[in-house]
């Protein structure tokens, strides 16, 4: 193995000099022995003259020029397979849950090529989530990619935790969760939530949280994806959850500046589209198995035209947009039914009844949005009888789109509800057709199926 020595350290970027005939390849892993600590670097650029520029996967505190560095002659490799289930690992696949070695039988490199075009498959099967607004307005496909878009504090992580709970409890596949640059507290909550729901033995957890250096946060999504690819290649249907894809982009921005690249729009890295593409093209289903991915996407300053969320949009099959305005009304999940879209919402895929109900709900809510201005200026009395009916039904629908979550029982005090797609369609169709015009609108708030709303109305 070739050895080199550190010649420059700038934050997370470390330059290492090797003999001219033994320069490491790009993406090779290097190891630095710094006292008792072991630090892994990943080669990013060859600068010439035997010098390579690398990114540190851990803290570069205590590094100094002249330290010996060993070329491991392979990319970063992580454990894969069933041994990783129920365990918490870092970007290098090392356990961080104090439960001893992973005991894996196989390790895979985190840099892999995407499946070829002829290996890929697409399915039209729907994945029922038990969340009314998602199943009705933006249904998920098995093997599809879903983005949860929202600003700070509108409920991306809670929605994701509910999806994992529902899918793990109702559909018994394996899941991989990659925590990319999020709060350590959320990682802890997530672990305990999975343990309490008895689904921890079906989930592999990989964390590179906010306190980690940018190199770590940039690669941890690939670590999680590699574990998911192994399950897929064994012929399983696996779920991959990434929270948060924006932090992956942000880590790339931090690294890009340190590597000396010119920034592009809004200060993002010039390689933004390519970095996103490398990750997203690997998240795909093949003829052997499928990866269904759910990705939380932070939207800076609630601006969906920001380059980072805008680049992510292009890769997704379904987009769930969380709205601050809906959250401020106390309606959770705060999904915007007019902004959220899905490729699956097609009569040939979901059936005519589902399609007509979803479009009918959207047109009623859209009409209500238009009438809001008139109501604000002139009041309800100036509306025609027909418009008054539209407003009454829309307000009931808006409240019926809310739902108590299992993972939020602690906050809401009401037990979580799983609503089947059949019940969801029946409920909204009933409201649209005027079957429940006699019920007060507060009966529809925070209930599961329509029967619960009818029961609640009796108590009001």
Curated annotation (Swiss-Prot):
CDD domains named among the record's database cross-references: ATP-synt_F1_beta_C, ATP-synt_F1_beta_N, F1-ATPase_beta_CD
Subcellular location: Cell inner membrane
Pfam families, per the entry: ATP-synt_ab, ATP-synt_ab_N, ATP-synt_VA_C
EC number from the UniProt entry: 7.1.2.2
Enzyme's top EC category: translocase
InterPro entries per record: AAA+_ATPase, ATP-synt_VA_C, ATP_synth_F1_bsu, ATPase_a/bsu_AS, ATPase_alpha/beta_chains, ATPase_F1/V1/A1_a/bsu_N, ATPase_F1/V1/A1_a/bsu_N_sf, ATPase_F1/V1/A1_a/bsu_nucl-bd
Keyword Chaperone appears in the UniProt entry: no
UniProt KW keywords: ATP synthesis, ATP-binding, Cell inner membrane, Cell membrane, CF(1), Hydrogen ion transport, Ion transport, Membrane, Nucleotide-binding, Translocase, Transport
Assembly behavior: F-type ATPases have 2 components, CF(1) - the catalytic core - and CF(0) - the membrane proton channel. CF(1) has five subunits: alpha(3), beta(3), gamma(1), delta(1), epsilon(1). CF(0) has three main subunits: a(1), b(2) and c(9-12). The alpha and beta chains form an alternating ring which encloses part of the gamma chain. CF(1) is attached to CF(0) by a central stalk formed by the gamma and epsilon chains, while a peripheral stalk is formed by the delta and b chains.
Xref: HAMAP family: ATP_synth_beta_bact
Protein name per Swiss-Prot or TrEMBL: ATP synthase subunit beta
Organism expressing this protein natively: Erwinia tasmaniensis (strain DSM 17950 / CFBP 7177 / CIP 109463 / NCPPB 4357 / Et1/99)
């Amino acid at each position: 193995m070739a050895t080199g020595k550190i010649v420059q350290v700038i934050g997370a970027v470390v330059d290492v000099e090797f003999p001219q005939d033994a320069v490491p390849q790009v993406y090779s892993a290097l190891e630095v022995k710094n006292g008792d600590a072991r630090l892994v670097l990943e080669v990013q650029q060859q600068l010439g003259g035997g010098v390579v520029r690398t990114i540190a996967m851990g803290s570069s505190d205590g590094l100094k020029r002249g330290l010996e560095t060993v070329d491991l002659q392979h990319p970063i490799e992580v454990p894969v397979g069933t041994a990783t289930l129920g365990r918490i690992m870092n970007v290098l696949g090392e356990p961080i849950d104090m439960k001893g070695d992973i005991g894996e039988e196989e390790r895979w490199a985190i840099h892999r090529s995407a499946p070829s075009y002829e290996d890929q498959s697409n399915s039209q099967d729907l994945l029922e989530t038990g969340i009314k607004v998602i199943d009705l307005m933006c249904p998920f496909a098995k093997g599809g990619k879903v983005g949860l878009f929202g600003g700070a504090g509108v409920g991306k992580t809670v929605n994701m935790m509910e999806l994992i709970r529902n899918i793990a409890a109702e559909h018994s596949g394996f899941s991989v969760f990659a925590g990319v640059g999020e709060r350590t507290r959320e990682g802890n909550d997530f672990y305990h939530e999975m343990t309490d729901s008895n689904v921890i033995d079906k989930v592999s957890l990989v964390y590179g949280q906010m306190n980690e250096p940018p190199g770590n946060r940039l690669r941890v999504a690939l670590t999680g994806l590699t574990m998911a690819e192994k399950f897929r290649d064994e012929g399983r249907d696996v779920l991959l959850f990434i929270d948060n894809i924006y932090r992956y982009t942000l880590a790339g921005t931090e690294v890009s500046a340190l590597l000396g690249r010119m920034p592009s729009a809004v200060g993002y890295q010039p390689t933004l589209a390519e970095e996103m593409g490398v990750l997203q093209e690997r998240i795909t289903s093949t003829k052997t198995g499928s990866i269904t991915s759910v990705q939380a996407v932070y939207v800076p300053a609630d601006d969906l035209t920001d380059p980072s969320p805008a680049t992510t949009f292009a890769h997704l099959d379904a987009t769930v947009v969380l709205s601050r305005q809906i959250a401020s009304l106390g309606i959770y999940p705060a999904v915007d039914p007019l902004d959220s879209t899905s490729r699956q919402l097609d009569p040939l895929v979901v059936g005519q009844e589902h399609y007509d109900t979803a479009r009918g709900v959207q047109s009623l809510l859209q009409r209500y949005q238009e009438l809001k201005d008139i109501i604000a200026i002139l009041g309800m009395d100036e509306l025609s009888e027909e418009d008054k009916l539209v407003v009454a039904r829309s307000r009931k629908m808006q409240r019926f789109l809310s739902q108590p979550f299992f993972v939020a029982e602690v906050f809401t005090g009401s037990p979580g509800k799983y609503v089947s797609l059949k019940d969801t369609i029946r409920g909204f169709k009933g409201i649209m057709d005027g079957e429940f015009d006699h019920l007060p609108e507060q009966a529809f708030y925070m209930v599961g199926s329509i029967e619960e709303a009818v029961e609640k109305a009796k108590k009001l």
